[in-house]
Swiss-Prot record:
Keywords: ATP-binding, Cytoplasm, Glyoxylate bypass, Hydrolase, Kinase, Nucleotide-binding, Protein phosphatase, Serine/threonine-protein kinase, Transferase, Tricarboxylic acid cycle. One of its GO terms (biological process) is glucose metabolic process. This is Isocitrate dehydrogenase kinase/phosphatase. The keyword Nucleotidyltransferase does not apply. Signal peptide: none annotated. InterPro entries: AceK_kinase (IPR046855), AceK_regulatory (IPR046854), Isocitrate_DH_AceK (IPR010452). The gene is aceK. GO terms for cellular component: cytoplasm. One of its GO terms (molecular function) is protein serine/threonine kinase activity.
Length: 591
């Protein structure tokens, strides 16, 4: 009877995962219709819905197991035996790797993230490595320019499954061919082979055609973002073939793609050639399998720990008032723990901070907010923790620690991509780097605002610089929606004494923000302030922020490009800004 019960439990978990991934694919499959109908609010809603599906179905399975097994559901040995049976269901199962992560999630929900041992859950995969690289059915089509690139692209784009007319397909093909001819030699292009994924990758207002361009000297990405104009006609906005560009398109600071992948391991294996710098975790994250990505991130961490002897240290940069941040010197992740007590000027709670991190995961990150993975009961060997960090942990987060003798358990933390803090980057930057990164910093604030996110604390220390020179926000404890903020101009002083007073002569409500004050607390360096004012002086105008708020309230969703504007084939967009003159001087705001 026990054996039958264990088998029933294993099958219940796998069936629960089937139900979850079936709904995942169903929501994903709707991306084409949402794109064709230009239903951008539905795009954002579907993104949130798909993220919530996983935890919802884990909860359903846990409830089923409690009904089926009763008290045995709390018996770790029973679940260890059941894991053995579950493993036996996976050799012929097409989504084995994510099914293992789903099992882990069910186990952790039952045991409150305790007793996390390899005999009880899938710390590492039970399946042979070769299964991760198998592509059992074609997921891409191959094209060869036998009759020239023009004809080949006509055939390729004619096969695109979108049910909308093209604005001017011959023009776009000319753009692509001209770009390729300026990037590669005629001999390279004559010997090229192009492999294109069968499924389009949907995100924001674009449908991406993803391909591999195989040339005699290597494999290159081939990415075409397809947009549609206000009349519902399609156009190709650019062609990207550089690995750095592809890396940013699939970057950790962007929302997940909607791409129909009934066998995700096959798609990840196919993507490796064009994204060699991405880890397995990053590739699963890019296609929306964020919970399995969390599993893979942890495996990458364990592999790094096993291969190195480094100690954890306090992360470089200004210490946070809300988060304790630590890292390994050569590891590309940081670990963030919410402090037990915050600095007096921080009027937030731990629950509010966690809600902000969840908001970021569900919101459109527009390439400007880093994604995070959340872990509970994270175990670290004490000898791997530097004395300085150990002291800091016991001083700042003792309520989140459990001492196991040789090991330390951190009850809750976030893992996040490591970047160079912007304030440290500025200290080492040359003149050109300084110009570029200040331009990026202002762009990051503007793009977040256009996506209905107000960063709150916009100090340099709260932003990081990626290896591609992108500026990304990573301090979320004060973020809120743009529509929740009251942007005000500072009223003129009533008397001369007002300007000399220590306290403001005007009332200030909790959500009041005065953009005129930004230059004073953002930039103490005069040269940096001058640069910032030249490039982004509009951020100091309340009218700029109010105009953005009005567009958001009217339901306008801004275009988001995962590449530099100069890479666009043509400037089809309307003017970005209108310049007006008011009492504060010249002020730019969105057109």
């Amino acid at each position: 009877m026990t054996r039958d019960l264990e088998k029933l439990v294993a099958q219940t978990i796998l069936q629960g995962f089937d139900a979850q991934y079936g709904r995942f694919l169903e929501v994903t499959a709707g991306a084409q219709q949402r794109f064709e109908q230009a239903d951008w609010p539905a795009v954002q809603q579907a993104m949130k819905q798909r993220i919530h599906l996983y935890d919802h179905h884990v909860g359903l399975v846990v409830a089923q197991l409690r009904c089926i097994t009763g008290i045995r559901c709390d018996d770790a040995d029973f679940l260890a035996r059941m894991k053995h049976i579950y493993t036996g269901l996976l050799p012929d199962y097409p989504r084995f790797e994510i099914a293992e992560s789903f099992f882990n999630s069910v186990y952790c929900r039952l045991f409150n993230h305790r007793e996390l041992a390899p005999d009880k859950l899938f710390v590492f995969s039970s399946q042979p490595e070769k299964r991760f690289h198998e592509i059992p059915r074609p997921i891409a089509k191959t094209f060869v320019p036998t009759d020239g690139w023009q004809r080949m692209l006509e055939k390729l784009l004619g096969d695109v499954p979108l049910r909308l007319p093209w604005e001017d397909l011959p023009r776009d093909i000319d753009y692509i061919v001209t770009y390729l001819q300026s990037t590669f030699s005629a001999e390279q292009l004559e010997q090229a082979t192009l492999q294109v994924a069968n499924e389009l990758f949907y995100r924001n207002k674009a449908a991406w055609l993803a391909g591999k361009l195989s040339l005699p000297d290597g494999v290159f990405p081939f990415l075409l973002p397809i947009h549609h104009n206000e009349r519902g006609a399609l156009f190709i906005d650019t062609c990207l073939t550089a690995q750095a560009d592809a890396s940013m398109v699939f970057g950790f600071a962007r929302s997940y793609f909607m791409v129909y992948a009934p066998q995700p391991s096959a798609l990840v294996a196919w993507l490796r050639d064009i994204l060699p710098g991405k880890t397995t975790a990053e590739l699963y994250l890019a296609i929306g399998c964020q919970k399995h990505s969390k599993t893979e991130y942890y495996r990458e961490y364990l592999h790094y720990i096993a291969e190195s002897e480094e100690q954890f240290i306090i992360a470089p940069g200004v210490k946070g008032m809300v988060m304790l941040v630590f890292t390994l010197p050569s590891f590309d992740r940081v670990f963030k723990v919410i402090k037990d007590r915050f600095a007096p000027q921080k009027e937030v709670s731990a629950e509010r901070v966690m809600a902000c991190y969840q908001l970021v995961k569900e919101h459109d990150r527009v390439g400007r907010m880093a994604d995070t993975q959340e872990y509970e009961n994270f175990v670290i060997d004490k000898h791997r923790i530097s004395p300085e960090l150990l002291d800091e942990l016991w001083r700042e987060v003792p309520e989140k620690l459990e001492d196991l003798g040789d090991q330390l358990v951190i009850r809750h933390l976030y893992m996040e991509r490591r970047m160079t803090p912007l304030n440290l980057y500025l200290e080492q930057a040359n003149a050109q780097q300084l110009h570029d990164v200040i331009e990026e910093y202002g762009n990051a604030i503007k793009q977040l605002a256009a996506a209905n996110i107000f960063p709150g604390d916009m100090l340099f220390k709260n932003f990081g610089v990626t290896r591609h020179g992108r500026v990304v926000f990573y301090d979320y404890d004060e973020i809120c929606y743009m529509t929740e903020v009251n942007f005000r101009k500072i009223p003129p002083p009533r008397y001369l004494e007002d300007e000399l007073a220590a306290e403001p002569w005007y009332s200030v409500a909790p959500n009041d923000v005065f953009p005129e004050e930004f230059p004073h607390f953002l930039c103490s360096d005069r040269h940096i302030r001058t640069l910032f004012e030249e490039m982004h002086g509009d951020l100091f105008c309340a009218d700029y922020w109010r105009a953005l708020q009005q567009r958001i309230r009217e339901g306008h969703i801004e275009d988001v490009y995962a590449y530099r504007r100069r890479k666009r084939f043509s400037q089809r967009a309307e003017p970005l800004y209108i310049t007006t003159e008011n009492d504060s001087g010249l002020c730019r705001y969105p057109a």
